[in-house]
Structure formats: C-alpha cells, structure tokens
Amino acid sequence: MSEEQLKAFIAKVQADTSLQEQLKAEGADVVAIAKAAGFTITTEDLNSHRQNLTDDELEGVAGGTASGGCDTSMFCY
C-alpha cells in the first residue's frame, strides 16, 4: 500500500515550494511529479485520499479558508 508514500509526499510538498509550483501547473501529473521526487504513489491512492477529505479540507480547497498553496489533499489553489 502506498498510503505511507502518499503521506510522505504530501509532507514533502508542504515544505517544498518548487514541488508546489509544479503541482499548480495546468495538467500537472501528480503521480509523475511524485515519482520524480522519489515517491511511489498511484492514481488510485490519490483518488482514495480525495474521497476521504474532511468537510474542513473540502472547504479549504474550495477557497473557504485558505489563501493559496497546496494542502494535504494534493489540491493546489
């Protein structure tokens, strides 16, 4: 299971503005970006993580609380 890899990648993204910029690019391939950064995650891992977002995380992604950046759901805004 790649859950640990996904969590590690999310932590890396939160600390690395270069990765954040890559993920913000239109059509960004999150799986490929993660692989290039040394992580093994799948599209299924991402989809599963997105389905398990809390209401607060969803509100943040929708622009309700955050002012910009990448959050733990792998959405950049």
From Swiss-Prot:
The keyword rRNA-binding does not apply. The modification 2,3-didehydrobutyrine is found at T65. There is a cross-link at S67-C70 (Lanthionine (Ser-Cys)). Cross-links are proved in vitro, when coepressed in E.coli with the ProcM lanthionine synthetase. The lanthionine residue has both a DL configuration (with 2S,6R stereochemistry) and a LL configuration (with 2R,6R stereochemistry). DL and LL diastomers have a 4:1 ratio. It is unknown whether nonenzymatic cyclization occur, but authors favor a model in which ProcM does generate all thioether cross-links. The beta-methyllanthionine residue has a DL configuration (with 2S,3S,6R stereochemistry). This is Lantipeptide prochlorosin 4.3. Residues 1-64 form a propeptide. NCBIfam families: leader_Nif11. GO terms for cellular component: extracellular region. It is found in: Secreted. InterPro entries: CHP03798_Ocin (IPR022516), Nif11 (IPR012903). It comes from Prochlorococcus marinus (strain MIT 9313).
